[in-house]
Amino acid sequence: MPELPEVEVVRRGVARWVVGRTVSSARFLHPRVTRRHVAGPDDAGARTRGLVVADAVRRGKYLWLPLATPDGRAEEAMVVHLGMSGQLLVEAADAPEEKHLRAVWTFDDGGEDLRFVDQRTFGGIAVVPLVATPDGGPGGLGETPDGSWSGSMPAPVAHIARDPLDPAFDDAVFARRLRERTTGLKRALLDQTLVSGVGNIYADEALWRAKLHYARPTRSVTPAQAAALLAGLREVMTAALDAGGTSFDSLYVNVNGASGYFDRSLAVYGQEGRPCPRCGALVRRDAFMNRSSFSCPVCQPVPRSPHW
């Protein structure tokens, strides 16, 4: 599933090619694409037609497009769930349809279409109300911080925490809330109500950078270690963004269909049996929450009282 860097790559592409354009039509080609929009596909289409895509905003792994009236007011947004394999692509109107095309939006300027392609159909869209953010800050990272919608976010996303690349992220609050938990460190990182945007790949990479074992009890994490962990998250996510994200297959692409290449720079994730780039010990893989955790047995020793 795409994590923060992959979604941010898509957000930037949508911001460049779609923001500021007026939707003229919406066509949904698979019933699952609007399953999160309770009123159905016809209603989803009607609530976008004639409105301007005012911005492309991201918080963690969540992406939404505020929909504004001609006077600039945005009371709703289209939330895009990429799921396991969702892709937002900008294509010429006469380009051949992709095999797994699920939705198409056209615009009144007659330019390129926005297409949603999803092989596994776990993704989808929903048009939902915007609500004020719980902390009064910006909803997420967008292109127009002074827009009328900037202090709001989609109602279904309101419980999601800020992500480490969000300028409004509070490091001290994160460290305090982390120590209040009674769980393992990686489990906490995957909890989107504590910190958003972190999935299996970047959790493993950040823990390696901070020299912390994934099963370390959160209550034992010192402020200095929490700071090192956040630094690791920001470092690996920024590097992944520069590389266009991590692509292990053709499913994670930007709006022009190009895959990222950060998978070539991973230190431990997916590197079982290969030498740790820091100490040379062989990277190990452990079963973890129906997935895998990768770590260095020397740089990231198992704590005395692990919380598996």
Curated annotation (Swiss-Prot):
One of its GO terms (biological process) is base-excision repair. Keywords: DNA damage, DNA repair, DNA-binding, Glycosidase, Hydrolase, Lyase, Metal-binding, Multifunctional enzyme, Zinc, Zinc-finger. Binds 1 zinc ion per subunit. DNA binds at H100, R120, R181. Signal peptide: none annotated. The keyword NADP does not apply. The active site is at P2 (schiff-base intermediate with dna), E3 (proton donor), K61 (proton donor), R291 (proton donor). The keyword DNA damage applies. Its EC number is 3.2.2.23, 4.2.99.18. SMART domains: Fapy_DNA_glyco, H2TH. Pfam families: Fapy_DNA_glyco, H2TH, zf-FPG_IleRS. PROSITE patterns: FPG_CAT, ZF_FPG_2. It catalyses: Hydrolysis of DNA containing ring-opened 7-methylguanine residues, releasing 2,6-diamino-4-hydroxy-5-(N-methyl)formamidopyrimidine; 2'-deoxyribonucleotide-(2'-deoxyribose 5'-phosphate)-2'-deoxyribonucleotide-DNA = a 3'-end 2'-deoxyribonucleotide-(2,3-dehydro-2,3-deoxyribose 5'-phosphate)-DNA + a 5'-end 5'-phospho-2'-deoxyribonucleoside-DNA + H(+). A zinc finger (FPG-type) spans 267-301. CDD domains: EcFpg-like_N. Gene3D superfamilies: 1.10.8.50, MutM-like, N-terminal. Its cofactor is Zn(2+). One of its GO terms (molecular function) is 8-oxo-7,8-dihydroguanine DNA N-glycosylase activity. Disulfide bonds: none annotated. NCBIfam families: fpg, PRK01103.1. Involved in base excision repair of DNA damaged by oxidation or by mutagenic agents. Acts as a DNA glycosylase that recognizes and removes damaged bases. Has a preference for oxidized purines, such as 7,8-dihydro-8-oxoguanine (8-oxoG). Has AP (apurinic/apyrimidinic) lyase activity and introduces nicks in the DNA strand. Cleaves the DNA backbone by beta-delta elimination to generate a single-strand break at the site of the removed base with both 3'- and 5'-phosphates. Monomer. Belongs to the FPG family. This is Formamidopyrimidine-DNA glycosylase. It comes from Kineococcus radiotolerans (strain ATCC BAA-149 / DSM 14245 / SRS30216). The lineage of its organism: Bacteria, Bacillati, Actinomycetota, Actinomycetes, Kineosporiales.
